[in-house]
Amino acid sequence: MTQFDNTPLTPPSSGAPGPAGWLPVWIKAISKPNEQTYVEITEHPDANSKTAYIWVFIAGLVSGIFQAFASTIRLAMGVTTQFPIPGLEQYIPQSTGVDGGSIGITLITGLCASPLAGVLSVIFFALGVAIVQWIAKLFGGTGTYDKLLYANAAITVPFTLISSLLAVFSSIPVLGICTGILSFGLGIYVLVLQVMAVKGVNRFGWGQAIGSVMIPVVVVFLFCCCVFAGLAMATGASLNQFNNFAP
């Protein structure tokens, strides 16, 4: 197991505080996959939770903007929504034509909702990091919420921006599969980096780091599966009753 030097690392400031100094931190966080990288990042004098919150808000805002354009492109191209419950589409009214007004309304609505996406991103990101750090503490971790928040933001934000751009290209049917595979690969890489960040910030072993990250992921996944299964069963029962009473 890698041995960490507990002496606080205080690298000299890059001389470019604020937005000008963000990009080097992001590049280091995603291009040097090693737990020591996140020790150095979080011990930097410029590392603080306020900066992390700003990063996440901007990423959520940009993601909302790109999603608005992606939805508009799909609407303009006549790409229909794929329903997760088989057979449900026949009971949902489908638009047979799209006019310019509908496209404009979709775009404006999406753009206006982008700031809300940024706020929600901050809330859920902060909650997720808090849960991971709480579990890490139970495993004997010595890190803090602020440090893990900063490290995770430095990892997640650049990939969120990249994924947002890919979402626009995924609206094109030919490129949809390619962007989907690429997004999946990036998601796995982000998960690995987050485990390294938890390990570096909390100064413990790989088992504790993996457990701290994966336990919440598994719990959320199982919860979503249960919710989806419940909705599918309820929807199926409702559709059966509708068919029975239909003339």
Regions of interest found by a model, annotated:
Residues 74, 78-79, 140-141, 166-174, ...:
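Short helix-capping/hinge motifs at transmembrane helix termini and TM-loop junctions
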Residues 1-62:
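N-terminal juxtamembrane cytosolic/stromal segments of multi-pass membrane proteins
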Residues 41-46, 98-107, 202:
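Helix-boundary and loop/linker segments of multi-pass membrane transporters
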Residues 223-247:
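Juxtamembrane boundary at the C-terminal end of a transmembrane helix
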Residues 60-75:
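Alpha-helical transmembrane segments of multi-pass membrane proteins
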Residues 104-134, 145-220, 224-228:
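Selective recognition of hydrophobic, aromatic-rich stretches within alpha-helical transmembrane segments
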Residues 76-103, 241-247:
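Membrane-interface interhelical loops and short interface/amphipathic helices
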Residues 32-37, 75, 129-139:
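Hydrophobic transmembrane alpha-helix segments characteristic of membrane transport
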